[in-house]
Amino acid sequence: MNIISKFICVLFIYIFAVAVYSQDESRASRTWSVQKYDITASLPQSENDRYLNVRAILSLKNVGSGAASRLTLRISPNAEVSAVKINDAAAEFTKGEEKIGTATLQRVILRTPSVQSNGNLLISVDYKLKVDENSGLSAISPVGVQFLPLSFWYPTPNSWYFARGADFAPLRLQVNAPNGQTVVSSGALTANAFDQKLNVQPFFITGNWDTITTSNVSMLIPKGMSDDAQKRANELAVLANEAKTFTAGLLGAAADIPLRIIAVRRGAGFSGGGTIFVDDNVFRRQKIDSQTVMTIAESIAKMWLGNIATVGGDGFGVIREGLSRYIATQFIESKYGKEIADIERLRQRTAYAAIVKRDSPLTIVSPLDDYYFPAVTNKGAMIWRILEKKIGREEFYNALRSSMKDGDLQLSELRSAFSAQKPFLDYAFEQVTDMNLLVGLPQPVGGETKVALRNVGSIEAQVNVTATTAIGENLSAQTTIPAKGFGEAVFRTNNKIVRTEVDKDKLYPQTEYSDDTAPRQFDESDAILVIKRAFDKQDYATAEKNARTVLQTSPRLDDARIFLARALSAQGKTAEAEKEFQSVLNENLPTARSIAWANVGLGEINLKNGQLANALKYFDQAVKADAEYGATLASRQGRNKASNLATIEEGIKNFFAQFDKAAVSNRKTEVQSLLLSGEVAKFAAGLSGQTEQWQTKVLQVDKFDDNNILVETNLNVKLLNREPESGTAIFRLTKIGNNYKLSGVEMFEVR
């Protein structure tokens, strides 16, 4: 071997060793575990103060195998740490930076007295945290403050991005808030502090709500909402209790955990320790939507899977997210029926199919990966479904309850409990999905019909194969297709088979689902995308045809039915379209998007027929739904055609007269004086120094609650070095005392 060859060989070995070391470091075992958070936060006393002042006390335990004398805490880079104490003694610290994908965390690095394995440490951190612009993760304003875990507002050793799971621990949280604001977190409220015995990540929100307590669930809805909002609140409270009872039947009785459901403008879908955030628009809609039901059911399941029992280790997301979704879907099936649950499974399967070809094994996928949630949640739910089917419901949940008894639940522990299924679980968790099931065209042979099957995956598939005859007869056959092999299903019938499908129940994660049927319906797994593509091209006949094809096998899929109705309406098939729109509204659990478009469609039909009062009713419902940008825009345009301009309150007129004047003054301070603190900063920055003309005409006003309104306007504007522009803009105004402040730009169709 010559010198160059030796050098290349050594270099290769070195690079390989560094890569292995780096990979090992990225998946390092945790050294410190939080045993309890004790946090006191003080909110700003003035509108212009953008700082949250905090003292966080962390009780830590060395869970490593040896002594530890170094501690690194992670916190937001916007935190200004002023003091740290170790066991009540002042300590020196250094700061560092930690790159997390495209984001950055701040490191607070401490040298500590040597702490032996299983030893404890008490850390106190004083700091203030600045919020420049409000978001769903962190917000400070006179009407409400919100801090969620992913804003990294509190120090902790293991952040959300830690490969083996973030820190969850019992919490005591006290928030010193100005008078008039209600503080909400999780746990029991005692002596002005929240005491949470379960394992949670710290969070809180403040605001001004009406509280309705139903079935031991506290519903916090915006003040002054309608009677319909109270009906939705009661329905959600009953739903949460039913989900809790259902989950307790599977995973064991829960402690007496206070349940709270909070209407929020931002951050809907978050939950922790029995407190659940839902979109405040839910309470304005005419019925509950499917996503809200899934959010509540999953949040209830996570009380067991993460709060009662901590969930960590490699593949923790498969339990916390995937098993929670599986149980939530089972609850939906118990309440709404199998057809509705199958629609939810179809949506989950479609979401997973979108990322399957860049997937990672579930034991190593990280929250840093942009496909993390579609993978661990949806593929995870499918795996638990297969496992329960293989071993039986009773054995499955007995093993889960047994594994949770010690208050800790890890995927490795569950895999040991289900050791008889090791080949399947090794494939499911440690390999990327490589299965694709294919079905051939039916081949009549004598008095029977044979169907060829293929499995390109690494494990066998036990599947149900179905066939439909020319006279509408449905047949089924059970068979096992070997790994990387072929199989066959035989149907004993003299009738002609016109359609076959493999894995009718869609148990298995696959790289492609469109070839599960013969003849093939579409060339891709997302059937809704196929329909939408034709609709967006204004090929309404093809969109109608594709929608009808999908509805033959999934008649309760409101996503497809709403496209069918819209395609029919676009072709002038008004009677058929009206029937389909109404069918969507009659569904038990449609999406919010479908609710909105069904109302838009019925409003447009009534408008064409001269039924202005009915048209207004439907357009108003679509505006209230506020579920999709296009539906909201269409409903507002339709409403303006069906009605005269509304009577506008003088205070609103005066506000926009002031805003028009401030905009053309090109003085930043004048514009900012009309904005709610922390809101619409980028919009305001776009006006400063560039506005030559700004004229606002108020068209409609929609009262959201006692303190918030949506104002529909027509704008005529001219910015520096640009042509004059005009169009519709929807502004959100919030009342502070007797004055309005601009708190949001919900729509800006100014061209």
Which residues does each predicted region cover?
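Juxtacatalytic substrate-recognition/specificity segment
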Residues: 56, 173, 210-317, 323, ...
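Exposed beta-sheet edge and beta->alpha loop/turn motif
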Residues: 470, 482, 611-612, 688, ...
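Acidic/His/Gly-enriched intrinsically disordered linker/tail segments
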Residues: 315-382, 386, 390, 404
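A surface-exposed beta-strand-loop module
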Residues: 78-143, 485-496
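Extended, low-hydrophobicity, Ser/Thr/Pro/Gly-biased non-transmembrane segments
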Residues: 57, 108, 113-116, 120-209
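Amphipathic alpha-helical substructures
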Residues: 365-366, 373-445
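Beta-strand-rich binding/interaction modules
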Residues: 82-85, 421-425, 437-504
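N-terminal, polar/Ser/Thr-rich
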Residues: 20-53, 422-423, 561, 599-602
